[in-house]
Structures are given as structure tokens and as C-alpha cells.
Design a protein with these regions (language model features):
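N-terminal hydrophobic targeting signals that begin at the initiator methionine
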Residues: 1-2
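Hydrophobic membrane-insertion alpha-helices, especially the h-region
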Residues: 5-16
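N-terminal low-complexity, Pro/Thr/Ser-rich intrinsically disordered segments
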Residues: 21-57
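An N-terminal structural lobe/cap that precedes and organizes the functional/catalytic core
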Residues: 55-69
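Short pre-active-site segment immediately N-terminal to the catalytic Zn-binding motif
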Residues: 66-84
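Active-site recognition of the HExxH zinc-binding catalytic motif
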Residues: 81-98
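Post-HEXXH active-site segment of zinc metalloproteases
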Residues: 94-143
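Long, well-structured alpha-helical subdomains associated
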Residues: 137-228
């Protein structure tokens, strides 16, 4: 099966890199041509009220779709636009229409994606990651967050997307600080690739296997284009 071959490639790739490595962007709203056939994007969530004028543009996109914008701002540092973009992405993702057994994620440009969860847990993914390749956010997302998200492993993909959007904000702002946002995006990509490879082994009938594989390549490419 094509997706199984992609998963084997993902496993080889994942085990050959360290989370802190620069890994592979496409414009935020444009998938790579080689991935588009397996991907299905949804419209929305819609703009809530009047569009927000803000810098960076990625933050304006997110805020325009949040009815409670201030809730997602970092209250300890209200000037932190990178974190506001990251957290706001989660807020808009909450508004993506729910599909039983799947996870919705907002992708900018008025588009979103819904990906079914494979039959594994975040704990399973955590156990599949060699100790030598467990990065700075491993403890938070693959250990502590299991209290709320263990049975919903595509949550890891949403966190990766949020870090990618934070990277777009950092680059638009021209910040020398906040480089960890990009490091964490690379680290989360690594964990998502491990999850894809694991799903190929433990859930061979996973219905969204090709979609997840294609999405990983799409999101990786748009990140790479932003940081090159």
C-alpha cells in the first residue's frame, strides 16, 4: 500500500534525525502539489465580526476568527504576539466542525483539516521515541498532556501546526528572540512522523493514513519555506 510505504519512509526519516535539527515552507494556504491528491481541506471557521487589522498578518488571520480574542493572549506577557498566534490557533481549531473520532485543525487562509485518530495513544508514541531523541517538549506534550489527550493522538499534529504558525509570526516580526518556537516546531514534526510510522504497524486499516502522511509533508514544506 502506498501509505504503508510512506510510513516506512517516515520511520526511517524520524530515526535518522534529532528533534533540534532544521527540517523542512508552501504558502500557508497552498499544499504541495505532490500531496494535494490525498488531502481534503475544509472551509472555515468563518470570520467573526469585522476583520482584525494586526501585525503580523498571521495573527490577524487567527484573531479575526476568534470571538474571545483576549482569552488566548498570554496574560503574563500581553505583548507576546508569537504566543498569541500559537494559542489563538488552538482557539480557532476548537471552532472547526466536529467529526466523531477525528481532530479538526485550523490552517490559516480560512481553511482547516480534519484527521481521524489512529488506534493508538500518545503514550504509545512516547514509548516509540528513543530516549536519545526526546527533546525539550517531550515531557510536556508526550507525558503530561496525556492526562487530557492520550486517546486523541492527532492532538500532537495540532500542536505542531500551532508552532508552525508561531514561526510565521516570528518571521513576519523579524524577531531575533523566540527561536525556540522554530526548534519546537521541528521537534513536534519528528514526533508526528514517529506517530505515522507507528500507526502503520499497529493500525494497518487506519482510514486516514494517506491523509496524515500527506498532511505531514504539506505542513513540513510550508514550515521549511518560511525558515529558509
Amino acid at each position: 500500500m502506498r501509505w504503508f510505504a510512506l510510513a516506512l519512509f517516515a520511520l526511517a526519516f524520524a530515526l535518522s534525525i534529532r528533534p533540534a535539527l532544521r527540517v523542512p515552507v508552501v504558502e500557508p494556504s497552498k499544499p504541495a502539489d505532490r500531496c494535494s491528491a490525498a488531502l481534503e481541506f475544509w472551509a472555515g471557521p468563518s470570520v467573526v465580526g469585522r476583520p482584525v487589522r494586526s501585525s503580523p498578518a498571521v495573527l490577524a488571520d487567527v484573531l479575526a476568527r476568534l470571538p474571545n480574542q483576549e482569552y488566548w493572549r498570554d496574560q503574563t506577557d500581553p505583548t507576546d504576539l508569537v504566543t498569541w498566534t500559537h494559542e489563538g490557533t488552538h482557539g480557532v481549531s476548537v471552532r472547526v466542525p466536529k467529526v466523531r473520532g477525528a481532530h479538526g485543525i485550523y490552517l490559516l487562509g480560512g481553511r482547516s483539516v480534519s484527521i481521524a485518530h489512529p488506534r493508538l495513544t500518545i503514550g504509545d508514541v512516547a514509548a516509540a521515541i528513543p530516549e536519545s531523541q526526546r527533546g525539550r517538549i517531550y515531557q510536556l506534550y508526550l507525558v503530561e498532556q496525556r492526562r487530557d489527550w492520550d486517546a486523541e493522538p492527532i492532538y500532537l499534529v495540532e500542536e505542531w501546526v500551532a508552532y508552525v504558525h508561531g514561526t510565521f509570526a516570528r518571521r513576519e516580526l523579524g524577531l531575533s528572540a523566540r527561536g525556540e518556537t522554530e526548534d519546537f516546531a521541528r521537534e513536534m514534526e519528528f514526533y508526528c512522523r514517529v506517530m505515522l510510522a507507528l500507526a502503520a504497524k499497529v493500525d494497518p486499516n487506519y482510514p486516514d493514513a494517506e491523509k496524515l502522511a500527506a498532511f505531514i509533508e504539506w505542513n513540513s514544506e510550508r514550515f521549511r519555506r518560511a525558515v529558509e
